UniProtKB/Swiss-Prot annotation:
This is Hopanoid transporter HpnN. InterPro entries: Hopanoid_biosynth_HpnN, MMPL_dom, Mycobact_MmpL, SSD. The gene is hpnN. It is a multi-pass membrane protein. Residues 1-16, 296-299, 352-373, 427-452, 740-743, 795-809, 859-877 are cytoplasmic. Homodimer. Belongs to the resistance-nodulation-cell division (RND) (TC 2.A.6) family. MmpL subfamily. SUPFAM superfamilies: Multidrug efflux transporter AcrB transmembrane domain (SSF82866). Residues 302-428 form the SSD domain. Residues 38-279, 324-332, 395-399, 473-718, 767-774, 828-836 are periplasmic. Essential for hopanoid transport from the cytoplasmic to the outer membrane. Is capable of shuttling hopanoid lipids from the inner membrane to the periplasm, where they probably spontaneously insert to the inner leaflet of the outer membrane, strengthening the cell envelope. May be a proton-motive-force (PMF)-dependent transporter. Is critical for multidrug resistance and cell wall remodeling in Burkholderia. Keywords: Cell inner membrane, Cell membrane, Lipid transport, Membrane, Transmembrane, Transmembrane helix, Transport.
């Protein structure tokens, strides 16, 4: 009945080709207008997975209470010295706050910086650390006084000369204790002389953490997002970069601003997908043209196939938008699917038409004969493929669910256009007749070999596949989405550089507590877990033992503030600067000779460097002035601020800081960071899994970070398992209804399952992990695999033998080559996730093709009935 309907449909199209073509083009035109007016793509990746109500409620509660924390952009200010990094971050923050007031961007903050931390930083040390620090500062009063009196290159050279005089001779100062100062000074002068970015950090002399290069400071910006654009946060990122350029931070401080955070990571991900897409698309199209030529051997046939594909694709796009409203970053892949499988249908019909045309020159008869031969296989393949795609609709993975809906409908569109528009176009274009039947006659000996050794090959294949099943225990799912991002993109490279920095907070999880008291209690419980490295609440910003600390700071301030606030000396002339540098160079040389041992080499090095600086031009000395004196002035101002702390209470905390940790309704946030053992990668999957499990067990309300990622991974894996189960059940029922023989159903499904199992086994052998991106390849290959298996089992049921060198294999191989080109081009993508999907698609397609072309004929054996004589020509029985 189905075959009869298809033959009548094709016959009707062949008799009225002009009407069919005109009607198809009109439908395509209307569909194109609809797509142009309604095309939308939602780039919000948080909407790709439908969370369970409980999980969604936890996440939404945090987002409602602290909306300013969602999708933040972290601007990382890098400079040669921490003094410059801090100053550049201050300047950037002040300027961006004006942009925020104008509504161009969201709220701006400076985590760990700003007036609050500048004045109260010492209060966050322990009482003993405060006592030691203030004692050292007080004993350094003479040096501080000299530096503050003349904070210039001349003043520094003079102070160094003074220190190398009487204090060194009397033993008050020892050369080894000056080694760090001298060696770092020499390195900075050398950078100045070499024309490199240079800055001398005074903080780094007493703080080893400040000596890390490059020095960093941070600014957070809440982006204004547009999920209708490919890069939703691009506007805010552009404002930040424009502001940094306008401030000339690189010239003033040697500072560079790099952006990372949730939104820049998403934006750069889409950029990496887009990068090279045009070139890959052109190359792919050219390769597809070549494959179509090899398969069809006719320009007119190729033109007919391409027009059919275009019409079907536009109609599918219109139907897809009508069904789902807007595409997402996964469902947009329906285009690749449609091209891959749409070409398959067209090639199957086209190759069969060529075979029929070889036997009968009459084009009408050949077109109808091809429909009679391929109508039922195409209809069954279409329905089976659509069923496999529709199996994803009930799952919680919305991205793939919508892809399954659109792709499934698209299969029926592809079938309809293949059986109407394609025959009509071929009738109008009237390709020339065929001189030989399609196929691979040179593969006939292989067919004979497989037929003679069927049982050993079958048993050996199944033994290898079953024997390798234990490998599946080592199949790894990489749940970390950061591994799917381009490590060379600005946002990802910056994040990797920050992997040991608490400001990145990539792997932190959060807990929303009813009050600050509850948050503090939860933090105390979580601190006891060995997997937890640090917890933070608003109370973290209210230091303990403040009276004791403030008293120690006040004692130091009484001696140091008068020196720090004295008016500086007037600027020296360049001649005075040269004289001071020469004197310091000479004294350093004498000190190195008179005090051999530790520190002498550094003194000699600096002596030579200062001599070169004195002999250089004034512009070089001006750069040295900025490298030493500018950072000194900033450091002295920071020291003066640190010596003037305020009492910190809940009421005196800055309102923006309070708002980041306590909501207006009193709910409070706990931020929990993992404990990273020494030598372990902060993004290690096993460590993060243990951390997430421990925190979730202790506090079921915890959400975010690895907890949310693991939940999403479990949801996606569950979605694919359920979809695979429903797909197999639906395909089995469909095959049973159509084939009416349980053995024939197994002859279709067993090669499909074997191909899938071998694909996963090869993933283990080749070290390929499954991830959020490439797992999508499995249902795609399920659809392609079902189609191939159906073609072969239907040909076998019709009595066809010698399948390997038949026109069917000719069509399947070139169809697979086209699909491989469409899918395999993803392998060349700059985006690691897309590239991994291309790799898995290539592997899965290879396994599927071998399963269909080689294993399935061996499994089926000789057909039950001989092929009808009128269909046997051109086929080696």
């Amino acid at each position: 009945m189905v075959t009869s309907l298809i033959v009548r449909l094709v016959a009707w199209s062949v008799r009225r080709p002009v009407w069919v073509v005109v009607l198809s083009l009109l439908i395509a035109a209307f569909s194109g207008v609809y797509v142009a007016r309604h095309f939308k793509i939602n780039t919000d990746i948080s909407k790709l997975v439908d969370a369970e109500p409980q999980w969604a409620a936890l996440s939404q509660a945090v987002d409602r209470a602290f909306p300013q924390r969602n999708g933040t952009i972290l601007a990382v200010v890098e400079a040669p010295a921490p003094e410059f990094a801090t100053a550049a971050a201050h300047a950037l923050t002040e300027s961006l706050q004006k942009q925020a007031a104008a509504g161009r961007i969201g709220p701006v903050a400076e985590p760990g910086g700003g007036p609050f931390f500048e004045h109260n930083g010492l209060l966050f040390l322990s009482p003993q650390q405060v006592a030691d620090t203030t004692s050292q500062l007080a004993s350094a009063r003479p040096l501080v006084n000299e530096l503050a009196k003349n904070p210039s290159l001349t003043g520094l050279a003079t102070t160094l000369s003074t220190t190398l005089g009487q204090p060194l001779l009397t033993g008050q100062v020892k050369l080894p204790s000056m080694a760090k100062l001298l060696s770092r000074s020499a390195a900075t002068v050398d950078d100045v002389l070499a024309g490199k970015p240079a800055a001398f950090s005074w903080r780094a002399l007493v703080d080893n953490d400040a000596a890390r290069q490059p020095a960093r400071a941070f600014v957070t910006v809440q982006p204004v997002v547009n999920y209708g654009a490919l890069k939703a946060g691009a506007q805010t990122s552009d404002v930040i970069r424009e502001t940094a350029r306008a401030l000339d931070l690189e010239k003033r401080y040697g500072a560079v601003v790099r952006l990372t955070g949730e939104q820049p990571l998403a934006d750069d991900e889409f950029s990496s997908v887009e990068d090279g897409a045009a070139l890959n698309g052109v190359v792919t199209l050219l390769v597809v043209f070549v494959i179509l030529w090899l398969a069809l051997r006719s320009k007119r046939m190729i033109a007919s196939v391409l027009v059919t594909l275009f019409v079907g694709l536009v109609v599918t796009a219109a139907l897809g938008l009508a069904m789902v409203g807007s595409l997402n970053m996964i469902s947009v892949a329906f285009m690749v699917l449609f091209v891959g499988l749409g070409v398959d249908f067209s090639i199957q019909y086209g190759v069969k038409y060529r075979e029929e045309r070889f036997r009968d020159e009459r084009i009408d008869h050949a077109l109808i004969g091809a429909a009679h031969s391929m109508g039922m296989p195409l209809a069954l393949a279409t329905t089976a493929v659509a069923a496999s795609f529709f199996s994803f609709i009930p799952t919680a993975y919305r991205g793939v669910s919508e892809l399954g809906l659109i792709a499934g409908v698209g299969m029926f569109v592809a079938l309809l256009t293949t059986l109407t528009l394609l025959p009509a176009l071929l009738r109008l274009f009237a390709p020339p007749g065929e001189s030989k039947t399609p196929g691979f006659p040179w593969l006939a000996p292989v067919d004979d070999y497989l037929d003679r050794h069927r049982k050993p090959i079958l048993i050996g294949t199944l033994a290898v596949v079953i024997g390798a099943l234990p490998l599946l225990a080592f199949l790894h799912f990489d749940f970390n989405p950061l591994h799917l991002k381009d490590p060379h993109s600005e946002s990802m490279s910056t994040l990797l550089a920050l992997k040991d920095s608490p400001e990145a907070a990539v792997n932190d999880v959060t807990l929303l507590a009813p009050s600050l008291a509850d948050a503090d209690a939860a933090a105390k419980r979580l601190d006891a877990l060995p997997e937890v490295g640090r917890t933070t609440t608003l109370s973290t910003f209210i230091p303990a033992d403040q009276p004791e600390k403030r008293a120690a700071i006040a004692t130091a301030a009484s001696t140091l503030l008068p020196a720090l606030t004295q008016p500086p000396a007037p600027p020296a002339t360049d001649a005075q600067r040269v004289a001071a540098l020469k004197r310091a160079s000479d004294l350093l040389g004498y000190a190195a000779e008179d005090h051999p041992g530790p520190g002498a080499a550094a003194a000699q090095h600096l002596s030579q460097s200062l001599a070169k600086l004195a002999a250089a031009d004034s512009a070089t000395r001006d750069r040295a002035e900025r490298a030493f004196a500018d950072t000194l002035r900033i450091a002295l101002n920071q020291l003066a601020a640190l010596l003037q702390p305020q009492e910190i209470t809940r009421d005196t905390l800055p309102p923006p800081l309070v708002r980041d940790w306590v909501a207006p309704d009193g709910k409070a946030l706990v931020q929990i960071s993992p404990k990273v053992p020494k030598g372990v990668d902060p993004n290690d999957d096993t460590m993060l899994r243990h951390f997430a499990t421990a925190v979730k067990a202790a506090e079921p309300g915890a959400i975010g970070g690895p907890i949310s990622i693991l939940h999403s991974a479990n949801t996606i894996i569950s979605a694919f398992l359920h979809a695979a189960l429903w797909s197999i059940i639906s395909i089995t029922i469909l095959l049973w209804i159509t084939l009416r023989r349980f053995g024939d159903v197994l002859r279709t499904l067993v090669p499909l399952l074997v191909s899938g199992i071998v694909t996963l086994e090869m993933c283990v052998v080749l070290g390929m992990s499954l991830n959020f991106a490439n797992i999508i390849a499995l249902p795609l290959m399920l659809g392609v695999g079902v189609a191939f298996k159906v073609y072969f089992v239907m040909a076998w049921r019709a009595g066809q033998t010698g399948l390997l060198h038949s026109s069917l294999t000719h069509a399947v191989l070139f169809s697979a080559a086209t699909t491989a080109t469409a899918f395999g081009s993803l392998w060349l993508s700059h985006h690691p996730g897309t590239s991994s999907m291309g790799k898995l698609l290539a592997l899965a397609l290879t396994c599927t093709l071998i399963g269909a072309v080689v294993f399935q004929p061996v499994l089926m054996g000789k057909p039950r009935v001989k092929r009808a004589k009128n269909q046997s020509q051109g086929i080696n029985e």
